[in-house]
Amino acid sequence: MNDVDATDTFVGQGKFRGAISTSPSHIMQTCGFIQQMFPVEMSPGIESEDDPNYDVNMDIQSFNIFDGVHETEAEASVALCAEARVGINKAGFVILKTFTPGAEGFAFACMDSKTCEHVVIKAGQRQGTATEATVLRALTHPSVVQLKGTFTYNKMTCLILPRYRTDLYCYLAAKRNLPICDILAIQRSVLRALQYLHNNSIIHRDIKSENIFINHPGDVCVGDFGAACFPVDINANRYYGWAGTIATNSPELLARDPYGPAVDIWSAGIVLFEMATGQNSLFERDGLDGNCDSERQIKLIIRRSGTHPNEFPINPTSNLRRQYIGLAKRSSRKPGSRPLWTNLYELPIDLEYLICKMLSFDARHRPSAEVLLNHSVFQTLPDPYPNPMEVGD
């Protein structure tokens, strides 16, 4: 399967899970389509070959991302995209493809005109782009996307990043039923990335399949650090602001409670569920794009899990406890038992156990990435994990 096939798969389904920036004033956010799009074949998205007939304005209009927005704002965004393209060309890169605009700016598949190396360049004026550059400069780990370099053009910050074959969102669409060993290999890479980040006082805050990049199950990395929070005290929960994606956010983050690295564990649990079942987010509202409000999302989690009152945070000042515990009083499920949603899926017992632990309603009961990696299911995997097949074959 080629690059376009994977993208078309998800555009056709109309599944859009928008990330929420900590500064919700960007034009993309007012339009409801706010995806970070930096590796090849990011999903869901559109792409266009960089040829003499390519028209950024027509590209954006055809995707209707500016419906209901004043025309001058659309024109301003088109102008910024054009400015980014000029800056990239002046920096010595040939633009091969233009990806769908994201919350923080624009992304392009490029080739270094001197070395012929294929890369992805993210260009943006917003804080998230600068935040990502700051975070990535300090990180070196095989499961974390590596920053190759940065440059500026006028007021734009541009990140030079490696180009991966696809993201996990598209990969799951192409593969459908992954072997358990591949699922565990991918999840191991994600958990290793989280262990590394948390040990370095960083919370990602937007772990989801769209932000996990893959060449094959043994070559996987976590990227898109525009929502990252740092430095944090990994031993004490605090409220660092609201960010991420509603469909994959943890209950405490949705409730605006103090939080810590456990928010990433919840989101990684959603990713594991998606790999194990081939379904979109367990707590994504049917018929919607995931951009519903936080209150409805929390209610959905409680209802589908059958959350028991004893599974709520014990802190009496917790927003989650104060505002939502009443919804759980009719639950007949025993606290600590299998959540109700497990009755809908036939999951291998080890995968179900991991998912349930990672999706513990009370963040105190979610294992750390280090603890999860010590589970026996990961110990039997080859390390490094071999490439069983080419992505898209």
UniProtKB/Swiss-Prot annotation:
Superkingdom of this protein's organism: Viruses
CDD domains cross-referenced by the UniProt entry: PKc (cd00180)
Residues annotated as catalytic: D206 (proton acceptor)
Any GO CC annotation of this UniProt entry: host cell cytoplasm
A biological process term (GO) from this entry: symbiont-mediated perturbation of host apoptosis
Signal peptide: none
Reaction(s) catalysed (UniProt annotation): L-seryl-[protein] + ATP = O-phospho-L-seryl-[protein] + ADP + H(+); L-threonyl-[protein] + ATP = O-phospho-L-threonyl-[protein] + ADP + H(+)
EC number, UniProt record: 2.7.11.1
Main localization category: host cell
InterPro entries per UniProt: Kinase-like_dom_sf, NEK_Ser/Thr_kinase, Prot_kinase_dom, Ser/Thr_kinase_AS
GO MF, one example: protein serine kinase activity
Protein name: Serine/threonine-protein kinase US3 homolog
Organism of derivation: Varicella-zoster virus (strain Dumas)
Source taxonomy: Viruses, Duplodnaviria, Heunggongvirae, Peploviricota, Herviviricetes
